[in-house]
Amino acid sequence: METIIIKDAHENNLKHLNLEIPLDKFTCVTGCSGCGKSSLVFDTIYAESQRAFLEGITGNIFGQKLMNKPQVGSIENLHPALNISQTYYNMNPRSTIGTVTEISYYLRSLFAIVNSDQNSSVAENLFSSNNPKAFCPHCAGLGVETVVSESLLIPDRDVTLRDGAILYFKGSSESKEQKYLEALCEHYGIDIDKKVSQLSNNELYQLLYVDDKIRYKLTYKEGKRRKQHYVILRGAVPAILGRVSGGDLSASTVAYAKYMEEVPCHVCGGTKLRKEVLEYKLGGLNYSDIEHMELKLLYSWIATFSDDRITLSKKEFVGQLVNSILCKLKALIQLDLGYLCLNRSIPTLSGGERQRVRIATQLTCSLKSLIYILDEPCKGLHYRDITKIIKATQNLIRRGNTVIAIEHNKQYISSSDCVIELGPVGGPDGGYLIHQSVTPQKIGYHLVFKRVLEFHDYFKINRINFRNIHGQNIRIPIGGITCITGVSGSGKSTLASVIVRCFSRKSDNIYGSIEGGQNIRRVIPVNQAPIGKTPRSTVVSYLGIFDEIRALFAKTDTAKQMKLNASAFSMNIKGGRCECCQGTGLQKITFNYLPNSYITCPKCGGKRFNDQVLSVKYCEKTIHDILEMPILNIIDVFKETKRIYSALHSMIELGLGYLKLGQMSMNLSGGEAQRVKLAKALSCSSYGKNLYVLDEPTAGLNDTDIDKFIQILLSLQQRCETIIIIEHNVEFIAKVADYIIDFGVVGGGDGGKIVAQGLPKTVFNDKASSLYRLDRLIY
């Protein structure tokens, strides 16, 4: 059997590994967080393949200049590698499922052929939302527009105007905002002590929308000084739009973005195209109708549609296009993405959905002898859906490719041809090859449920109507741990967002009524969205403790002698940073058709700061040392600084002690990003009466990590916290859940129905539940 032979791999924390990975087989790499899985798969195998490819196509050592060579002795029999990860470098809102899979291009060709005749020819790009001649001039083909939301501007209509019912005018009694409101009320004869609910429609219109451009002399207090100047009296909405005109949401105007929301374009109704373009039909439907159809419905429609204009001369071309579309749709549906539609923007997909879209694209690709790198392909998938991703992986193998996947899911691992386990722990002490097997063992479990607790207080949300959820009622125990379950697209994330928005009083129109929950002080949503997208965003900056760390360095005798203040230790301000890389430690190499690449700054060697700043030490550590050492190794340095110590301790409790404070946020996995957010929340929040909403917190964790995380959740519960978790891991659910809300086995438009809710054992025994008979399995 031919293998990829890796010798002396020592990238990051890898301990000079020597191993072989079989070609044309399916290999799973597993282990605890920070044990070296990504260092082996992405930073060694994939990075060397990419570097060798660039070097090969340029015909010289140009590739070596563009990319750093991985720390490895040699890699033999390495094939071209394709990274199908959770992150996707093209996050342009114009990138859709249709464009990424190329289905939209086939569909445009189909429209052009059918609508062309001997007298007139229709161009394919006439149906493109990127074509200025075709797209809606108001939204420029995005299908949405940003408007000021009345519900965000006035979250509570039972508050008086004087007390800040309209948030834009909220301020102290002598503030500019309050005086502006008083002037508006005086000019239009409105009682400032009225509640918004008591205002007439005309009065509310005058406060929100009037734009008479009346000049008014305003006297107000700013700090300790009293100021006077002329202002233009206008309602809150035109005032906000004036601040953010041109879509500029820079630092000076971002404060007003909280009042804005995206809604379908009022001109095109979300179709993205001009009216004249929508007059062209295919089988009685226009282009937008088809792009808005769920993929599973589109598959049935495209297979059976008829159109009288398809003549014999067109029939062959139409048949080829239809077959190509059906082939690509089938691949998407097989990966349980049938609830999506072609016009769904790529940035709005979850990491798991994006990865499955890309896998589906590869299933219809004719390339062979590739190495596919998959990053937790089971993430976001219910047990019943994982068999589909296993079949897709095996299809890639049958086509003559090699698959190397980082995964923790036992069902997926048991289907592989080879398992590589790294460990034994994360961070500097990890990176060892613990086990390699070419005959994965059968894995099973028998669930042991958490002890049943009694709850007397519940909060209830009645008649929920949002996205695919219609008329559903829920109740959640105060002080309990509630798990939301169901297959992909069934409504889990939608329900979680409803809960968050209802407690933040943002959208009263998405539910009928809410009962209970008055004692919940704060809602803390903790999702897997990236916490940063540039090298400037780091773990330490997100945790909010870098100011304190810089202040400690500025107080040292050496810094005082050099007259270095705290800003000299900032990566974002001129003075102390390396100006060659502007404090990032990296230089970005931009490619037109590949993700951006980063190489170590040749001047500072990745240390981010100039030599003067690096000569300053705090507790025998430079600022570079602090940023580059694992949290486990530096926490004792800050044991006398309560806020820093608390944040670092929370990171270690959540199994993130292997991370470095200077690690770029964009390099964190979704699971790591979520736990960093949770660590920040734990270190900043006062305990008791908070509501935590978590999105698949076990993603990226092995059994050891999960056990640690369970202890964190149970300790939070003991402090009277209420926790809501979207989750698929049935073993985790059984160990932590006091209550389950299940959406069943149907996703998309037919989903959104709560089929079971109650005690875990009750839901697991409910035949309609997605958890039915999953309390004991062998695979």
What feature does the model see in each segment?
Residues 2-348, 355-361, 365-370, 392, ...:
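P-loop/Walker A nucleotide phosphate-binding surfaces of NTP-dependent enzymes
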Residues 345, 376-377, 664, 694-697:
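Walker B catalytic motif
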Residues 375, 382, 695, 701-702:
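ABC-family nucleotide-binding domains
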Residues 406-408, 727-728:
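H-loop/switch region of ABC-family ATPase nucleotide-binding domains
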Residues 413-414, 733-735:
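A short, surface-exposed alpha-helical micro-motif characterized by mixed small hydrophobic
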Residues 418, 739, 757:
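Short, glycine/charged-rich "phosphate-handling" switch motifs in NTP-dependent
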Residues 421-446, 745-774:
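Conserved beta-strand-loop-alpha-helix hinge in the C-terminal portion
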